[in-house]
């Protein structure tokens, strides 16, 4: 978590064209993520220093190389820049697509990875044009606005579907109640007709029995 916050702060400094520095511990790379628009040219200088125990200070060494690598994380880590630089050499690359880019720094020396040498790297990066930074911020803000608008549209659609579902449920309930009411009325009518029929038949049988003197 601390490394992520550190990386975010570093990139904030980078794209305000302020020099920062960080340390390499052995052969572990330092990587940072940054959202950048398409066509942004990033330029800068890297300065690598090595700890000198005899002098008890950091000194610049031509034996130190810094490998700078830039990948597009949104395109299966597509590599757009890779270069081995010596101290005070320039970094220069242009983004080919909009999205999150990962910039990694690795310390090397004489073709081998550092195993225990302490290295301090100074980095000063900036975009080629302030307009790009403004455009990037505007694009991010527009993207966020579009997402909010899309969410609002989706929410309205969901609410509309819920209202339609409620209307259908009310219609179904009314239809069901009406059908049940008709069934009950028809059942009552059938019972009444059946009772009347039974009474008439009993009365008819009684008269028949009396007439035939069976009772």
Swiss-Prot record:
Q: Give the GO cellular component terms, alphabetically.
A: COPII-coated ER to Golgi transport vesicle; endoplasmic reticulum; endoplasmic reticulum membrane; endoplasmic reticulum-Golgi intermediate compartment; Golgi apparatus; Golgi membrane
Those parts of the protein on the Cytoplasmic side are 207-215
Concerning Pfam families, the annotation shows: EMP24_GP25L
Cell location: Golgi apparatus membrane; Endoplasmic reticulum membrane
Query: Any one Gene Ontology biological process term?
Result: intracellular protein transport
Q: Which residues lie on this side of the membrane: Lumenal?
A: 21-185
Q: Where are the transmembrane segments?
A: 186-206
- Entry membrane topology: Single-pass type I membrane protein
Signal peptide range equals 1-19
Would you identify the family this protein belongs to, as annotated? Belongs to the EMP24/GP25L family.
For whether the record's keyword set contains Kinase, the answer is no
**Does the keyword Endoplasmic reticulum feature in the UniProt annotation?**
yes
Give start and end of each GOLD domain.
29-125
Query: What name appears for this protein in its UniProt entry?
Result: Uncharacterized membrane protein C16E9.09c
Instruction: Name the keywords, alphabetized.
Output: Endoplasmic reticulum, Golgi apparatus, Membrane, Signal, Transmembrane, Transmembrane helix
């Amino acid at each position: 978590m601390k490394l992520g916050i550190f990386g975010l702060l570093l990139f904030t400094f980078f794209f305000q064209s302020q020099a920062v520095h960080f340390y390499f511990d052995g052969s572990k790379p330092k990587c940072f993520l940054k959202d950048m628009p398409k066509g942004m040219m990033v330029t800068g200088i890297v300065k690598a220093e090595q700890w000198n125990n005899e002098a008890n200070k950091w000194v610049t060494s031509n034996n130190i190389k810094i490998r700078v690598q830039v990948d597009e994380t949104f395109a299966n880590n597509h590599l757009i820049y890779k270069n081995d630089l010596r101290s005070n050499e320039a970094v220069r690359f242009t983004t080919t697509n909009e999205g999150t880019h990962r910039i990694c720094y690795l310390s090397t020396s004489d073709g081998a990875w550092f195993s225990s040498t302490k290295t301090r790297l100074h980095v000063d990066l900036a975009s080629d044009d302030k307009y790009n930074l403004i455009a990037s911020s505007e694009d991010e803000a527009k993207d966020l606005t579009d997402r909010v608008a899309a969410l609002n549209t989706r929410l309205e659609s969901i609410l509309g579907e819920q209202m339609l579902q409620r209307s259908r449920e009310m219609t179904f309930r009314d239809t069901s109640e009406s059908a049940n009411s008709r069934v009950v009325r028809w059942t009552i009518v059938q019972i009444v007709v059946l009772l009347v029929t039974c009474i008439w038949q009993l009365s008819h049988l009684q008269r028949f029995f009396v007439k035939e003197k069976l009772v």
